[in-house]
Each structure stands twice: as structure tokens, then as C-alpha cells.
Amino acid sequence: MSAGAVAGDLADLTLDELRLELAPAIADAAVFDGWGKVALDAAAEAMGVDPAVAALAFPGGAIDMIEAWIARIDADMARALPLEVLAKLPIRERIRRLIGFRLEAATPSKEALRRALAIMA
């Protein structure tokens, strides 16, 4: 990926890393535009990424975008609830916190989640 293709801190990212960075913005755009090229382009432009480079990060289209969004939520959850913290908790509390985190992460994007489930069904 060329340095001129992506703005700011995103210039040095691999395509896999770029996927994770773009995923929340794509989910936000998917509320209005669905999980497709329009949402991808809107997210890329909002983050200062060349839409052509962004498209390279999602060769599988909507499914890749949805998988990246889920992976980003998983990564955020792992950072917020590290194993060292979870290991000290009773199993019920671990489950409660993990499920709670996932529900809170999806709440602002209920429509994106509905659209994602329709694609994955």
C-alpha cells in the first residue's frame, strides 16, 4: 500500500489492520446504506482512506465487512476485559461482563446488526 493512498496514522497499516480500523465506520454507514460499496466508500472517505485501497481490504464484500466488524468488537472486548482481570472473577461474573460488553458494543448499531444478520442468514 502506498503512503499516499491513506491519510494520517492509517498509512502504515496492513490491509488486515485497516479492516479493523474501518469496520466501525462501515457499520455506522451500513445503517443507512447497507453492507456494501456505498457504506465502504463512505467509511473510507470519512477516515481519509482512498476508497480503492479500502476495497482491497474487503475482497469478500459484505461478509468480509461484517466479519471485520465482529473482529473489531472482539479486539475491543479483549482490551477492555483482559484475561488477567477475567481470571480473577467467578465464572458467572465473567460471563455477565463478556455478554454485557458485546451487547453494549452492538446497541448503538442495532440496524447495522439487523442488516448483518439478514446477510449472514
Q: What are these model-derived regions, one by one?
A:
Residues 1-3:
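N-terminal mitochondrial targeting presequence
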Residues 22, 39, 65, 69, ...:
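Residue-level detector of well-ordered alpha-helical segments, enriched
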Residues 16, 80-119:
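Hydrophobic alpha-helical connector segments
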Residues 6-42, 46-51, 60-67:
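Short, amphipathic alpha-helix enriched in basic
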